[in-house]
Amino acid sequence: MTNALTVGSRREKRRTAAAAARRRARSARPPWEEPPTAVGQAAKGLTLGGTLAVILVPLWIIVLTSFSTPGAINRAGGLVLWPDGLTTETYRQMLSDPTVVTALGVSLGITLVGTALSMAVSILCAYGLSRPRSLGHRFVLLLLIVTMFISGGLIPSFLVVTGLGGYDQYWALILPSAVSVFNILVLRAFYQETSAELIDAARMDGAGDWRILWSVVLPTSRAVTAVTALFYAVGYWNSFFNVMLYMPTDSQKWPLQYVLLTYVNRANGLPGSVNSGFGETHAQTAPLSLQMAVVVLTLVPLVIVYPFVQKHLRTGVLTGAIKG
């Protein structure tokens, strides 16, 4: 009997000690590491569900409206929430216009060439500024930072580009926005955190700066490089303001964004439309379906490219924000 009481007492003491240890562990953890309560889990689910709805519902409406007939759009009151009278007429008419096909090729060319040029300049500049013994790197860095807060202005930029013969030339759509100081600073911050042991080992093996950049720095910075390239590519793909400044007359040189903007203006009865075959036939389609088709057409390339860089996006953004 005494042995049974002793064993039971020991078990109770162990339970009490374990409970006290759990309480101490919980009290030592920060609040954000505490297991969520039922109310917290419900609030998290509602927040995530609401955020997802805010993102997906507009996309759903845009896609359905772009495929809807004028009657379906009128019955829905302007924006289609459920499939009704779907048609691809708007897309057929838009893609049958040679202006759109040419503009798509122009946009792809500008995006590819511009992104390659911007990445080359940004990587070289960031690597040079990241080396502490680079000649004049502090002065160059100061000049770059100043340009983030003080710009020359629209009219001086226009006069410089046109004075260099850039009016109605493709390079005028690339060079004025070829370099982003923010992207250079992000790359520089990452390059500064590259292992000094790796660089020293490469120098001992006889590698110069070009070899170190190509064989050591770039392979260890794929994430931030992919994110920076994505930022540049999206900027070139969505750009249309420079077209309004430097290439406003020749529609055969317009990129896709500006051509589609003129189609939206035509659908709304605004001036500045493209003089092409699409203009005479689009009256058979709903203007709103045309505008939604414009949005879908401009999103498709980004949706195709994003999965290839998605795995690097989170790592690259956080790395550029934390390091340095």
Q: Where are the regions a protein language model picked out?
A:
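A hydrophobic, multi-pass inner-membrane permease signature
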Residues: 2-324
